[in-house]
Structure formats: C-alpha cells, structure tokens
C-alpha cells in the first residue's frame, strides 16, 4: 500500500510531496522554495521573512470571516539520522516511506513525521476549498531541530492572529500547554599526544543497536546513552590495564539520545587477553542491566591497525573520569505536574580526534533557575578537567496557562468527540511556543498532534489511525474558533 492512498488523502499526499524534498536543518533552501511555490500557486499571500520562515495567509471561509485569526505553525526542517548499515544521502534523496499495518515509517532513516505531518496538515488546509476555517496565518519555521533560529528571529509584526495552534505534539490524546527551555553546552580540550609505546596492541570497540530517541521526550525512558556506556567500559578497562585512547566517536545530533559509539584504544600486548575478557564482562553486565529496555544491544570488539600516536595516559584518564562524572538523564522531576520531567541533560556528542577532545550536550528545564543550575553543573564538570566551555542557544520555556480560552474550547471538543478527557500536559521538549510567545505576547497558544514514536531516530513512525483522529479534531477546532 502507498502512503498516497491513505486517509485523509490530501494530508498524506502533501506529506509525500514534502518528504520528496531534502530538508535538513541549516539547509532548508529547497523546502523554502517548495513552500513559497506552493503558496503562490494557490494564489495566496505568500512571503518569506528575513531569516527564511515562510508565511502564507488565507482569508476565512464563507461565514467565518469575522472569527479570530488563527496562526497555524509547524517547522520545515527534520532530523536526519540513519542506521549505521543504511546507505542514504539526505542531501540528495527523498525519504523512502513504508506502510506497516497501522504505521508509516521509513527504510532505515528518520521519517520526518516530526514535524512534516504538521506541515502537511496546514498545507491540506490552505489548499482546500471546502474546509470550514477562520482567517489563517500559516507560519512555517526553519531550523527548529538545531537551534530554533526561525522562531527566535521571526517578526511578530507580520501577524495579527490571536490564537496559535502548534502542530508539533506527539500523542493524540494530549493538549500541550507548556514546554521546557534549553541551552547547549559545547566543550573542547587539546590533549597531549604521545608516540605509541612499543609492544602495544590496538582494539576497536563498537556499540550499536540502542534505541536512541528524543533527548527530551524520551529522557525518562531509561534508554542507554552510547557515549556514557563507552566511557564506562573504557574506565573499567583502564583500572586493570594501561589503556590509552586512540580515538573516540559517539553520538550525532545535539537533541538525540546517542545510539552508537566507537573507539580505538591501545593496551599493552601482554595484557590483551585480560582486556578482551574485561570487554566481554562489561558487555555482559550492560546486557543484563538493559535487557528489558534495549533489546538490540550490540557491543563488539576486534583487533585493528596501529596508530602512530595516542592520547597520553594523563589526558586519557581526564577524559574518562570527566565523561563518567558528567550528568546525563533526568536531573529533577516536576514537583507540581505528575510524571513531568522538569530538568535534564543529555551528553549527545563525544569526539576525540587529532588530539582534540570535544563534546556537545543539551540541558533542558521548564524552570529557568533550575536550567541555570544544570547548565552550571555540566560546565563545572568539564571545566574541572581544563576544558574550554561555551554555552549557547539559550531559549525560554513556555509557561502553562490553565485558564487559556483555546484550551477550554479544545478540552470540551475532545470530550464531545471521544467521550473522555484529553491529557492536558506540559512537555519536556523545546517546542517553539516558548520562543514564539516572546514575539506574540498576546497569542493564546496550544500544541497538539498525532501519535509519533521514536522521533529523531531511524525507528521513527507515525500512526495512521491517529493521524485521522488528529485531523478530525483539528477540523472541529477550526470550526469552533470564536468571533473577534
């Protein structure tokens, strides 16, 4: 079955069209042009702001002209992740989609349902001649996944909307009314290298098969972090053998839980057998600890070619001690909202290459002061070993408003449609609403969407029946927008 045959047909066809266009963060030129052409071909007012966000405006349908103007918002870029054994060029190829039962996924890559389903929903609305809707201002932002620069640099004066519907939530029974802010911590350290000692052997270690996922939404899942696992394995070996790091490469994207890591280490040849035994033991321990969470763990090692230089013992120990100490995972649960992660940190990227040790991590919190605390904790961990630390991309959270008018409307609509209450939640992720609210201080904002699982990983999938449910709820919401 083809994605294009699914219902609602217009939404899925627009999603297929969108997924044919490469749209990595920071390289959105092609999808911007695609969206500009889309709006102009419909004869709608279509503009691009100074940062690259696309804005398309559509008058209200017959009888809805005097309703409040609604801003429909989703982001154009997508996370590009693929399995290690998948051959795919994100800069040139469109996403290969598959229908598997009640789900749509991709063939070894991220799907782009985050936030492509939201974009396609808005496209279906703009292109429709029979959907009942108020005056609309569609805002398609860029670079949500790697810095939210589209939201940060948007021009609020271009909008008159009083209500903003963000279509970037990933559970169809949730109405999101708040989110976490975040800050990026990047570190660097120039290591001392030495000539590889005589009678040393080299081993390559690979960690693969972890689930990964979104480092906000999935941070409380208990999933493994490949960077922390590698540090743990190497630290344990270093306590029994004179281990020296040749290279280290783990993780990828700043906002994804690392699924894979690899390292090359040098150990005395006379201790090689003992090191191999320790590696087997560490792999066994991790399998035992995570077998109910991580079913596809692969920890392998093999002999590899020698390197002329390695990191000194002193700096090897500094690196391993720091990586083992740095906090990763939930830092604090919310004392006010049951089940909500308030504050967290994720060690997303680790690299030792050409004598340089660098890391990337992302701290999140719905409380500004606690975000400052976790950012300080991470900074101090790396500065204690002498790293240069820069913290950038600080963005605010979105303070929940339980008295929101659009929340009241949508809660009642959901009850009427499904005979149950929606889950009104704040989420532990960086929705653009927190930033958009600084440019649109009078907008009444809410976020919702269909069931999307394993976003930011090659296991990403979106539920077909949930998209239909979300679409019906979305259409009823547009009909229910009050008068000005």
Task: Locate the predicted segments by residue.
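Substrate-recognition/cap regions that form aromatic- and gly/pro-loop-enriched pockets
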Residues: 340-429
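Acidic, glycine-rich active-site loops and adjacent beta-strand->loop/helix elements
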Residues: 76-78, 139-147, 169-172, 211, ...
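Active-site-adjacent substrate-binding region
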Residues: 218, 225-227, 232-248, 400-443
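Midchain, well-structured core segments that form catalytic/ion-binding scaffolds
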Residues: 102-105, 145-146, 152-364
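His/Asp/Glu-rich mid-to-C-terminal helical/loop segments that flank catalytic regions of hydrolases
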Residues: 157, 223-240, 269-272, 318-324, ...
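Acidic/His- and Gly-rich active-site-bordering loop/insert found
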Residues: 2-102
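Zn-dependent metallopeptidase/amidohydrolase metal-coordination segment
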Residues: 11, 335, 342-355, 362, ...
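Active-site metal-coordination/substrate-binding segment of hydrolases
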Residues: 64-135, 140-146, 151-155, 161-162, ...
């Amino acid at each position: 079955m083809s994605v294009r045959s699914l219902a609602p047909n217009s939404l899925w066809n627009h999603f297929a069209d969108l997924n044919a266009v490469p749209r990595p963060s920071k390289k959105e030129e092609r999808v911007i042009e695609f969206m500009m052409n889309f709006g102009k071909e419909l004869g709608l007012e279509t503009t691009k702001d100074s940062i690259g966000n696309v804005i398309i405006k559509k008058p209200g349908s017959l009888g809805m002209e005097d309703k409040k103007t609604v801003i429909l918002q989703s982001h154009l870029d997508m996370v590009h992740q693929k399995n290690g054994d998948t051959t795919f060029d994100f800069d040139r190829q469109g996403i290969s989609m598959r229908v598997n039962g009640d789900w749509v996924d991709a063939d070894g890559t991220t799907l782009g349902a985050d936030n492509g389903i939201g974009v396609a929903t808005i496209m279906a609305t703009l292109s429709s001649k029979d959907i009942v809707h108020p005056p609309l201002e569609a805002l398609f932002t860029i670079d949500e996944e790697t810095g939210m620069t589209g939201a940060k640099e948007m021009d609020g004066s271009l909008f008159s909307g009083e209500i903003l519907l963000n279509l970037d939530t990933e559970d169809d029974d949730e109405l999101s009314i708040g989110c976490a802010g975040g800050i990026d911590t990047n570190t660097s350290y120039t290591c001392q290298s030495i000539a590889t000692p005589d009678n040393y052997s080299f081993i390559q270690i690979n960690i693969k098969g972890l689930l990964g996922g979104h480092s906000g939404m999935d941070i409380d899942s208990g999933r493994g972090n490949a960077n922390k696992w590698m540090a743990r394995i190497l630290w344990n070996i270093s306590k029994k053998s004179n281990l020296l790091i040749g290279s280290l490469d783990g993780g990828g994207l700043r906002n994804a839980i690392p699924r894979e890591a690899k390292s090359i280490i040098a150990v005395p040849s006379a201790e090689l057998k003992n090191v191999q035994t320790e590696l087997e033991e560490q792999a066994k321990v991790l399998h035992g600890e995570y077998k109910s969470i991580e079913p596809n763990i692969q920890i392998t090692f093999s002999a590899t070619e020698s390197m002329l230089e390695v990191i000194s013992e002193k700096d090897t120990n500094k690196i391993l001690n720091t990586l083992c100490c740095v906090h990763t995972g939930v830092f604090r649960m919310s004392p006010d909202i049951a089940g909500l992660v308030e504050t967290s940190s994720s060690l997303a990227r680790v690299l030792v290459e050409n004598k340089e040790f660098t890391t990337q991590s992302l701290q999140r919190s719905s409380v500004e002061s606690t975000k400052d605390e976790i950012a300080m904790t991470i900074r101090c961990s790396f500065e204690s070993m002498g790293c240069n630390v820069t913290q950038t991309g600080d963005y605010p959270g979105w303070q929940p408003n339980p008295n929101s008018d659009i929340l009241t409307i949508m809660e009642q609509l959901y009850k009427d449609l499904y005979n149950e209450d929606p889950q009104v939640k704040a989420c532990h992720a960086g929705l653009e609403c927190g930033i958009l609210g600084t440019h649109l201080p009078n907008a009444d904002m809410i976020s919702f969407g269909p069931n999307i699982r394993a976003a930011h990983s090659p296991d990403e999938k979106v539920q077909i029946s949930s998209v239909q449910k979300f679409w019906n709820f979305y259409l009823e919401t547009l009909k229910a927008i009050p008068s000005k």
